[in-house]
Amino acid sequence: MRRKFLQSLRAPDAPLITAAIVMIVFGIGLRAQRLAFPRGLTWDEHHFVLNAKTYLAHQPDLNDHPPLGKLLIALPIHLLGDTSLAWRLAPFLLGCVNIVLVGLIAAWVAERRTAFWVGAALAAVDGFLIAYSRSALLDGMLACLCMAAVLTALRARSWPSFALASLLLGSACAIKYSAVVFVPVLLWVALSKPSALATAATLVLSPAAYPGWFSLGLWMAKQPFGPSAVVAETKRLYLHHASLTHWKHPLLSHWYEWFLPTRPIPMRNDPLSDGRMRVLTAMGNPLVWWLVNLALLFAIGSVVVALVLALRRRALGPATRRALGLAGPTARRSLIVAAWCAPIVPWWVSARDSYVYHYLPAYAFGVVLVAALFADALRRFRTAAFVALLVVGQVGFYYSPVWGQNPISREGVEQRALWRRWHVGFTLRSPFDP
């Protein structure tokens, strides 16, 4: 492995890989620096940190999500003590894993190792992913398990190894129910395997992992933890979520607003004595964010073109078999488009309150598509693709103060809020903060 890495640094892509490594190190540094600051709870952390501690105290969980995310937060608290660093350690670690997962899935889509470095670099310098690596919240961990499930399924060579993907997806559902939408994605991958039916059958293990984690949480809370108790609690939480249709919070946004986005979340805003402030916004790297939209259009367009050509040649059957078998770049992009769509589809048909953070698992797969597009561009436009990656890195460096909570003036913050509606997401506390 070391030899292959050194060879890659002597290859024509060496400058790009070197730049990507710098961006990755920089992004991990932004996630890690002053992770314990502030020492109090910030945006939404009270929902999960306080209930993580109730598990450790063997008291009932009053939060409206399944237990696993809070159990992951509780483990470092149990090992290291009740500190702000311990609260945020699990999201930080899984947030760093997200960087690797984006790169690995991008390498599978593009069938090029260079795509790994590009994907990891793009994920590393994106503020949306950074913010959920620096906060004791569930969505970054949810994205991690969803991507891990998809990657494990893609790499599985037999049904026992595919079973691990099913268990990972069931575990993701034990963080948030919304992960269940990835079942069709894993089913598509299963049908592409040589032993398709046996592999697809392992998806029944997804529900097996979910009650296991839920029972563990109920047991720790000294509550009934049998199958009937899990079913009753699941039903209660589902009905609670289904009733959240008030649309009163000022930071709520519809799914079609996420493409800009219109309401990024203001995670933290701590004033300093010299008039500056330390800010953490969930606004991503604007260039990456909008490139996700373009990459999606490109991927969907390539699917439409392939479909039209297949119809003209009267070769729809073979084209369908290639798509189901994930043969070729168009089919692989189609799978990632499906993975992007899966977390968003429920919001198309639901009137439930929604925030931009519900977009995070889909967004991660969107970054994969951007990396694959970069990898394709490298084949013909190596210099242009390299310059484009440098520009993305420069934009990330420009926005780094509002992702890494470095001291910055109010004017500096507002300069980074390119759109007037972003000002709230960058500078003001939500009136609903604790």
Predicted feature locations:
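Membrane-interface transmembrane helices that cradle and orient dolichyl/undecaprenyl
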Residues: 107-110, 149-163, 190-191
